[in-house]
Amino acid sequence: FPPATGILAAFRQRKKQRFAFGRETLLQHLLFHAGTKEESRENALSTLSVHMKWPENFTRQVCRSLLKDGYITERNGLLLPTEQGKAHNLFYRENVRA
């Protein structure tokens, strides 16, 4: 199989897509619950994989990536969207998902 179109390339592409979608989904989840009475339960780092129904390892990878990019911050065990994260989410909703 040619490297750019083979089975391994398709697998890598699918994995990248799944991760990118996970980032957007988690950011949207955090924004949805930010400032609500459910925030302490829904945005808690300790229970996030349960709420998202994701494997723990995948949840950690997505969180690390969003933290590294400055889209979220961690405070007292809660993940909170930053202004940069809010702006990114708005851009994504207006331009990518349209």
Give the positions of each predicted feature.
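Short amphipathic alpha-helical interaction segments
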Residues: 52-68
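A short, conserved structural fragment
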Residues: 67-77
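Short, amphipathic alpha-helical interaction segments positioned at domain boundaries
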Residues: 83-98
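Long, low-complexity, charged/polar intrinsically disordered regions in eukaryotic proteins
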Residues: 1-17
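Extended, hydrophobic interaction surfaces within ordered domains
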Residues: 1-2, 61, 73
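Short amphipathic alpha-helical interface segments
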Residues: 17-54
